[in-house]
Amino acid sequence: GVIILGIVWGLWHIPDDLVCYTQTSGIQMIFAQQITCISLGIFFAYAYMKTQNIWVPVCLHYLNNNLIPIISGTFSADVLENQTVSWKDLPVALVLNGLCFGFFLLADVFKKKEVQEEE
């Protein structure tokens, strides 16, 4: 379910990918966004399931969206616009995101709970 959530979330970002983030490498950006959204979806779901507090993933999402402008000191959309993503960047993004976030899928909160039948 978490993977499907990440895919849907990535699809929801397609207009931003094509209009705001890049106008030269749209298809690559869509694939990169899918990798990012699936990875962050796993982590955000873990954070929610661990805390049972919707504000935790909301705050994490806010930090994710705003850390680059804060760290760069460029408080403008320019820091996020006109990105270039090449096909060779995608395997690197997949491996790095997989290493950073994939192991959360092994957490107890994602394990299927057995339902005991009443006799």
Q: Where in this protein do the model-derived segments appear?
A:
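Membrane-interface helix/loop boundary segments of multi-pass membrane proteins
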Residues: 1-8, 20-21, 46-53
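Small-residue packing motifs within transmembrane alpha-helices
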Residues: 2, 6, 33, 37, ...
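Residue-level recognition of pore/gate-forming positions within transmembrane alpha-helices
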Residues: 6-10, 62-65
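Membrane-water interface at transmembrane helix exits
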Residues: 12, 16, 48-52, 108
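Alpha-helical transmembrane segments of multipass membrane proteins
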Residues: 12-16, 40, 44, 68, ...
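Membrane-interface interhelical connector segments
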Residues: 17-27
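Functionally important transmembrane alpha-helices
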Residues: 27-87
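C-terminal membrane module of polytopic membrane proteins
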Residues: 62-119
